[in-house]
Amino acid sequence: MITPKVLSGFKDRLPKDAIQKAQLLAKVSVVFQSFGFVPIETPHLEYAEVLLPDASSDIQKEIYRFKDHGDRDVALRFDLTVPLARFVSLHHQILGMPFKRYAIGNVFRGERAQKGRYREFTQCDFDFIGSESLVCDAEIIQVIVASLKALDLEDFCVSINHRKILNGICEYFGVSQVNEALRIVDKLEKIGLNGVEEELKKECDLNSNTIKELLEMVQIKQDDLSHAEFFEKIAYLKDYNENLKKGIQDLERLYQLLGDLQISQNLYKIDFSIARGLGYYTGIVYETTLNEMKSLGSVCSGGRYDHLTKNFSKENLQGVGASIGIDRLIVALNEMQLLDERSTQAKVLIACMHEEYFSYANRLAESLRQSGIFSEVYPEAQKIKKPFSYANHKGHEFVAVIGEEEFKSETLSLKNMHSGMQLNCLSFLKALEIIGENDEDL
């Protein structure tokens, strides 16, 4: 006998959970489409050489990589951005530029499983390809805000930085292994200040004083300062080198654009510690956290990558985008009690008291569906207790009962499962009116 078990870091999704996820994905998809992003799909499995060049050393350790039956070196995708690079390199001539795409799919990372972190999880990516304009960067942040608000979230913050600022800080302190240093800095929230200090000392051969001063600069944050006050505070950094100057100027321009979009200023702040560990980022980067659940980590992150297709094509295509971590958001929304708790998408359950009533019940269910009301027929003619118990368990809002009187008069009796109130022998049109109203109106 095989024990029915699931691998650590993976999970089954019960109907209630799957319904919640489908509802959230539908909402963010509508937001993406409203901004003109179009859907694409790429395979879960890619040649390893496609995925590996842009993966950090930490990510490379987490990639599921193996030889397939044809002895090909293949790997499961760890994000949706690297496959996008391969996709646009292959199809850019027919796509047209700039190209706005969204993709929703599962990705795989063999990281340590913990709350809100899985080894298989769903990403919702949206990207703007083929333009270096900061208008695109601002629009991506606008989509982040619109998406989270569509999920009934209001209390969050998009933390923004620029890779050139981090490169400029490393340059100022004479750090030669820039990518490695930024990979370590990106783990500040995960391993803490002492952990970052130890890794910088070990991996980048930096002395304690340099590390201390570097980390002091990396931890510069806007906090409660206004945008104008913060940019005045950091203006001196522009004189340090061109990287810092360019990074700060880009952030100033971005803030102008976000102001033009009338995005509330309390929803985005500058934080120099935001690095994004993936090596392909070159410009503005951002991570989004829920203010009440910061321990959950980033629920939406991304940034600009100006060398998207360098590994696949001589024609360089820039891009900027973000990814929503829908599985983490489900954890948060459940704790906030903002998700539908039902285990069915059908609003009405139709129960028959006798076998011969099923033809009428099925016609009734189809009429409800044609009217936009999801309905199902309980498949057995039983005492009324059993279908009512089923409806309570699944979460149907109404039970329509077909007994002898209802069958003969082509009516139905309707019970509101929330209020417990029941109306007997209703016409279809009257029942339709009631079902379409708020529950408390019955």
UniProtKB/Swiss-Prot annotation:
Database matches in Gene3D superfamilies: Anticodon-binding domain (3.40.50.800), Bira Bifunctional Protein, Domain 2 (3.30.930.10)
UniProt keyword Nucleus present: no
Reactions catalysed according to its record: tRNA(His) + L-histidine + ATP = L-histidyl-tRNA(His) + AMP + diphosphate + H(+)
Subcellular location, record wording: Cytoplasm
Subunit structure: Homodimer.
Similarity section: Belongs to the class-II aminoacyl-tRNA synthetase family.
Name of the protein in its database record: Histidine--tRNA ligase
Organism: Helicobacter pylori (strain HPAG1)
Taxonomic classification: Bacteria, Pseudomonadati, Campylobacterota, Epsilonproteobacteria, Campylobacterales
